[in-house]
Amino acid sequence: MAKLTRRSFVGIMAASTTALSMPSLAFGALPRVVVIGGGAGGATAAKYIAKDSKGAIDVTLVEASKRYYTCFFSNLYLGDFRNYGSIGHNYYGLAVNHGVNMVHEWASSVNSAEKKVYLGSGATVSYDKLVISPGIDLKFDSVNGYSPEAQSIMPHAWKSGTQVQ
């Protein structure tokens, strides 16, 4: 029988504590990473976590929209170098080519103590690690006199979509 030293005991305790802090690992499941936001940052993070882990990490991307239009390619559309449809991307490739689980719902809140993402439907998604990449949006009440109705008069064009078309 191998001699149990203080150093090996501390190592065993540290490893077991780490496993307990990641619930999916404690029960033999794959570690779970949830990414909130399917824009350029979130989709790229989900893709490379899944790709680089070679299936060793269960990756879920939470994004309400089923299609993402790249703001940074909108100039190609506006300059008549590309059509509008060509700057839009769905999430099919992430799911099929990289094994990313897609959840097309709004992430309404996060409980970091329970390691859960609450969805607009009331469902939850558990995680071991969380990436939050919601992208850009506008809080209309933060700009005096600006409202959702005013954006048709003075477009902000922060999000690619109808204001770009």
Language-model region placement:
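N-terminal secretory signal peptides and thylakoid transit peptides that target proteins
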Residues: 1-17
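Glycine-rich, N-terminal phosphate-binding loop of Rossmann-like dinucleotide-binding domains
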Residues: 13, 134-135
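A short, basic/flexible loop-to-alpha-helix module at the beginning of a structural domain
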Residues: 15-29
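Beta1-alpha1 glycine-rich phosphate/pyrophosphate-binding loop at the start
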Residues: 27-101, 149
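A conserved short coil-to-beta-strand element within the FAD-binding core of flavoproteins
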Residues: 105-114
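Redox-cofactor binding/interface segments in oxidoreductases and associated redox assembly factors
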Residues: 119, 132-133
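Core beta-strand elements of the Rossmann-like FAD/NAD(P) dinucleotide-binding domain
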Residues: 121-129
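Glycine-rich dinucleotide-binding loop and its adjacent helix/turn
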Residues: 135-165
